[in-house]
Amino acid sequence: MEHRAVIESTTVEAVQQLLSQHAFLQALATEVGVDTGQIEISDDTDAVQASMPWAFRTDRAGIPSLAQKFLPQEVQLDWWQQWKHSDPDGDIRVELHGRPAATCTGRASLSQNGDDVEYVVVTETKTSGVPWPLGGKVESMINKDLVGWILSVQARVANREG
């Protein structure tokens, strides 16, 4: 599934740096409304990686009712991202723990479009512990309604913080 957002009045380089800063990741977690564990950031010669565990309740506003039926009352997930230094591409992985368990992997790209940066993430979600034929519906729901929503919040925070 393709997710698109625009981050206004900035450059690709500035967005790449912003997306892996501790203050930005904390602001993202706060905006999403999750409890986050320790945010870990590592920067080597090839890429910068960031990861953080999240926990949030599913009985709150903004979580679709279908999602509430399939997800546990409290969701535990791990958010991981990597941005290469050599080009404007990155990888995202979200692992949802519990039942159903799910892994969402994504390929992200940033491109300059005039004064703005277009942020595109293509994701795929796989679940386990969900009987057929519900698995595909749950994967689509997690991909669109959970991960897609988190990515839209990420862009909103980037527009505000950037």
PLM ranges: what are they?
Residues M1-E2, E74-W79, A101-R107:
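Short, surface-exposed coil-to-beta transition loops
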Residues M1-R60:
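Hydrophobic ligand-binding cavity/cleft-lining segments
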Residues T11-Q16, S20, Q73, V138-W149:
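Short amphipathic alpha-helical segments
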Residues L25-V34, Q68-E74, L96-A102:
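Short, solvent-exposed secondary-structure boundary motifs
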Residues T36-T45, V94, R107, D116, ...:
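Soluble, non-transmembrane catalytic domains of enzymes that act on hydrophobic metabolites at membranes
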Residues I39-V94:
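Glycine-rich portal/gate segments that line the openings of hydrophobic small-molecule binding cavities
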Residues A50-S51, Q82-W83, P88-K144:
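Beta-strand/loop substructures that line and gate deep hydrophobic ligand-binding cavities in soluble
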Residues L77-W83, L134-G162:
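A conserved amphipathic terminal alpha-helix motif
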